[in-house]
Design a protein with these regions (language model features):
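Conserved alpha/beta-hydrolase
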Residues: 178-198
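Accessory cap/linker subdomain of secreted extracellular hydrolases
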Residues: 201, 268-369
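Primarily recognizes the serine-hydrolase "nucleophile elbow" in alpha/beta-hydrolase
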Residues: 226-291
């Protein structure tokens, strides 16, 4: 079977789970459960919602101190349980009881570890506003999370990885950034969820429906810029303290937005590629083959086939050789040679279009125009982005433009989503702390 992998897919969290009580039943989830909760001892946790590609609505528990990020499952309307790993329900390690105030909305959580003392955390005041962002002729549907209290507040725009992702595709990050005192803007990607338009990103490949003159990532950058302008025009927001965070493709895009918008306050690249897109695809071919356990002889075959189809796409030569090699792979039951892109090309014209308008894109030249502080985080064990190469390339490109406020870190045992491998029970150590400390110095936020 051909392995299908969306390039730079979202956060890469292991969303598949065993059968569970349906959290979408009436009364099981209400929006008042989502938010930031603070204990009297300074312990801060978040409850976020996530909607999977299949439309399932899931709930995440995040402990910003320990790094635990796991799915929780309903026992009753206001009692939920968390198991020992991301998707496991049993044996239960934590029981979460939502406490309601006089109006019936959630005002806090009671946390009952199976082995440990109980604690209570009060829900932090937070304004949640549905918004519409104009981007050219399109309309992006989103949500603005505003801190309570007098502004103007520093703010952050969250940018998606590739794929049909919505404002609920950011895992623990919306409320994590909110817990730091930032206003947070999240939105449905163009052509996804409630946003209008057609989605074009690194995962869509060569599309005949692309508008004339389209080049990747034009529309993504247009939407990121529109989100920035939207925040800049809000009276609650400090226009001099608006920055970007993105994961995967969104991490790359955060740096491009900072290059375009000279008044951006900061940019955070989480696992984003830094180099030509074709180079990242070629890296993925070998890394994913090894991750699937293929022997090195087969990894070599994968890389040779990857080099072949990319050469054909770049030069237009030897298309017949590519078709013959692909047909042979299918005939010989070697579908492991193919990925979703090389397996789906139907013509040389399509391959050439993909190269000229998407695969040849290189984010590095624009980085010489970035003047704001930049943070880059990559996972040591990421099979989708070459972490050492990306970190080095980003540092060098920014330095060439004279940017001296550049921080890069490769997270030990981190995955593409920066979850800790091998079991993905939590964010890898250092992720939340690094973001928090770095932003305190650059975004003017106080201690929670």
């Amino acid at each position: 079977m051909r392995i299908v992998v969306w390039l730079l897919l979202g956060l890469g969290l292991p969303w598949l789970a065993p059968a569970a009580p349906d959290p979408t039943e009436p009364g099981a989830i209400d929006d008042s459960k989502f938010g930031v909760y603070r204990g009297s001892d300074g312990h801060v946790v978040g409850i976020d919602q996530f909607i999977t590609d299949s439309g399932e609505r899931a709930v995440l528990y995040s402990d910003y101190q320990s790094g635990v990020v796991r799915r929780i499952f309903p026992i009753s309307q206001d009692e939920w349980g968390m198991g020992p790993s991301f998707a496991a329900q049993t044996p239960r390690e934590l029981t979460i009881r939502f406490v309601r105030g006089a109006t019936g909305t959630v005002s806090g959580v009671s946390l009952h570890p199976t082995n440990g003392p109980r604690s209570f955390a009060a829900k932090s005041p937070l304004i949640r506003e549905a918004v519409t962002i104009g981007s050219g002729s399109e309309r992006l549907a989103g949500t603005l999370l505003l801190p309570a209290g007098k502004g103007p507040h520093p703010a952050i725009v969250l940018l998606h990885g590739s794929g049909p992702l919505t404002r609920h595709s950011f895992g623990p990050y919306p409320h994590f950034f909110s817990s730091l005192g930032l206003a947070v803007l999240i939105f449905d990607k163009r052509g996804t969820g409630e946003s209008t338009g057609t989605r074009f990103d690194a995962s869509t490949g060569a599309l005949e429906s692309a508008p004339k003159g389209y080049n990747y990532p034009d529309n993504l950058l247009e939407d990121a810029s529109a989100a920035f302008r939207f925040l800049r025009n809000r009276p609650e927001i400090d226009p001099g303290k608006i920055g970007f965070w993105g994961s995967s493709e969104g991490g790359m895009l955060a740096t491009q937005a900072a290059a375009k918008l000279q008044d951006a306050a900061f940019a955070i690249n989480s696992s984003g590629f830094m180099g030509p897109l074709w180079q990242t695809l070629h890296y993925q071919a070998g890394a994913l083959a090894r991750e699937r356990g293929l022997p090195e002889s087969q990894v070599d075959e994968v890389l040779a086939f990857s080099a072949l189809w990319m050469r054909v796409a770049r030069t237009g030569d030897d298309y017949a050789q590519f078709v013959e090699a692909r047909n042979s792979a299918r005939h010989e039951d070697k579908d492991w040679l193919l990925n979703w892109r090389s397996g789906d090309f139907t013509s040389l014209q399509q391959m050439r279009w993909d190269w000229e308008h998407t695969l040849s894109f290189d984010p590095l030249p624009a980085l010489q125009s970035v003047t704001c502080p930049v943070l880059g985080l990559w996972g040591e064990r990421d099979p989708l982005t070459d972490a050492p190469r990306a970190a080095k390339s980003m540092r060098e490109a920014l330095a060439a433009g004279g940017n001296e406020d550049v921080t890069t870190r490769i997270i030990a045992d981190g995955s593409h989503s920066l979850m800790e491998l091998p079991d993905r029970r939590r964010m890898a150590p250092g992720v939340f702390d690094t973001l928090k400390e770095w932003l305190r110095d650059r975004a003017g936020i106080g201690r929670p």
